Amino acid sequence: MANMEREPILSARDVEISFSLRGKKLNAIRRCSLDLYQGETLAIVGESGSGKSVFTKSFLGMLDANGSITGGSILFEGKDLAKYKTEKDWMTIRGKKISMVMQDPMTSLNPLKKIGRQIEESIELNQGIKGPEAKKMALEMLKKVGIPDPERRYQQYPHEFSGGMRQRVVIAIAAACHPQILICDEPTTALDVTIQAQIL
């Protein structure tokens, strides 16, 4: 079926994003649009600093405190995400329905918590599953992203992992709740080519 005959699961139209800096408004994104369909992989391509990450973070309410959506619409499940204002609003979709793999795993992981616990927390928060079942799912995700000896790694902290291994953990956390949309911000940068192909 052609895309024109289907409804996109996410439709962004003429999105504009600005940041306040020293009393001035800086326009970071001007009139960006896209349609994403079920089962589709969509790449956003642009030079470094062109606003790719800022644009996609707006789908999750993850802009910096001085940033805001100042124009356009982001339609998802019949609602305009561009109108969401509170953290309570965003928590209804973030992780559960739309999730994101960040570019830098060290800024995504809590250095004071064990890896297994961090995956479990995502499962608990977004699926309401706790205890042994959550642990079982966390271990399964570690296996899926190619982490050897998951039982041992489950008990370790982020600093005990290489950059590539941390990247895999971040992917496991984002994918653990089987979101409808998984946004990946250069998710395989720290991985070797074999694992890159497997993850993608």
Language-model segments: which ranges?
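Conserved ABC ATPase "signature" region
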Residues: 80, 133-152
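ABC ATPase NBD coupling module
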Residues: 81-99, 117, 125
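Conserved ABC transporter NBD signature motif
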Residues: 69-80
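A short, proline-enriched helix->beta-strand linker immediately N-terminal to the Walker B motif
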Residues: 176-180
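Conserved ABC ATPase signature
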Residues: 156-161, 165
